Amino acid sequence: MTDLERLQAWLETYPRAGELTSYQVDYTDQLPGCFGVFPAGMVEVERTENLLGQVTVQNQYNFALYVVFAKAPGDTEGAQINADWVMDFQQWVQEQSVLRKAPTFGNIDQHRERLRAENGALYDAELTGTAMYMVRLAATFWKHY
């Protein structure tokens, strides 16, 4: 299973995932209930080498999660419901990471790995009655070579 497949399988365990209907990578339909994960690459944060030449690398995967909900222009109640979903999702990610239930990506120090959901916000709203929200996902992990 690839790292992206593990992330997807884990996202589907979110208790409110049933409110979403269609999962895609690098794309999402502009229909309520659709969501997409957009991988934004890996960043090497730090690299250390010991006296034996063994290398440990701290990495960070970055993803953007886009979710489309119904929201008519001026619909404050719908906006509140959508914002509550986004905030609940971010809290769930934090809880899963703290309890070590989130997916891990490294080959050492997996107890130190951290998955964060940050900066959830309205990304775009259409006059047709949909709104797209974006949450940044970041996974910090270590690899030993």
What does each model-identified segment do?
Residues 32-43:
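Charged, often glycine-rich, active-site loop that binds/positions anionic groups
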